Curated annotation (Swiss-Prot):
The keyword S-adenosyl-L-methionine applies. It is found in: Cytoplasm. Coiled coil: none annotated. Keywords: Cytoplasm, Methyltransferase, rRNA processing, S-adenosyl-L-methionine, Transferase. HAMAP family: 16SrRNA_methyltr_G. Specifically methylates the N7 position of guanine in position 527 of 16S rRNA. This is Ribosomal RNA small subunit methyltransferase G. Its EC number is 2.1.1.170. It catalyses: guanosine(527) in 16S rRNA + S-adenosyl-L-methionine = N(7)-methylguanosine(527) in 16S rRNA + S-adenosyl-L-homocysteine. S-adenosyl-L-methionine binds at G81, M86, V132, E133, R147. It comes from the Bacteria.
Length: 214
């Protein structure tokens, strides 16, 4: 199955419900990304969502739901455990003036991400094949995002060395992770919690923003 007009309409309408007006270029790139995700998922197992009709809401719109929170927080971003590229690819499309690094330890997934970068001509995107614990960039990131990556404790512990006191950690979760917050490392604190209302998604979605005391 390929991308259809219905997918395009669902994307535009859903983005509007999120308060986002997509440019023609952004719409084209997001749909091209969706097409690549559908194609490569058959062989590479990039996402457990097999039905292309569910991918607009559960992947594209879910990723776009954090756009307002990324918009106000820095120019240099890391997406940890990026997998099939969510939310990193949609965010790189929405913010072409900012830099996004997508990190994953799975070689098949990083090969897919490199292909997306090339085909969509995303000059602001870097793909890194590495374990997060051993990744050593030249400077700390302004923001670090994760989506269904790990517990908040592991997310904090594994990425501590990649941020600073000025960094915002954005963890996208389903149900509110109250138990995980109890296990947050002592040098991290919860800065804000936001309920995300994603068009077409029935389940709960939460964004937790963490800060670190250095």
């Amino acid at each position: 199955m390929s991308v259809t007009q219905r997918h395009a309409e669902e994307l535009l309408q859903g983005a509007r419900e999120l308060g986002i007006e997509l440019s023609e270029r952004q719409q084209e790139q997001l749909l091209a990304y969706l097409g690549l995700l559908i194609k490569w998922n058959k062989a590479y197992n990039l996402t457990a969502v097999r039905d292309p009709d569910e991918m607009v809401s559960r992947h594209l719109l879910d990723s776009l739901s954090v756009v307002p929170f990324v918009a106000e927080r820095g120019d240099n971003w890391l997406d940890v455990g990026s997998g099939g590229g969510m939310p990193g690819i949609p965010l790189a499309i929405m913010f072409p003036e900012r830099r996004f690094t997508l990190l994953d330890s799975n070689g098949k997934k990083t090969r897919f991400l490199v292909q997306v970068k090339l085909e969509l001509k995303l000059a602001n995107l870097e793909v890194v094949h590495s374990r997060v614990e051993t990744y050593r960039p030249e400077q700390p990131f302004d923001g670090i995002s994760s989506r269904a990556f790990s517990s908040l404790q592991d997310f904090s512990d594994w990425t501590r060395h990649l941020g600073s006191a000025d960094t915002h950690w954005l963890a996208m979760k389903g149900l509110h992770p109250g138990d995980e917050l109890q296990a947050l490392p002592a040098d991290f604190r919860l800065d804000a919690t936001h309920v995300l209302r994603v068009p077409g998604c029935q389940g709960q979605r939460h964004l937790l923003i963490l800060r670190r005391s250095v």
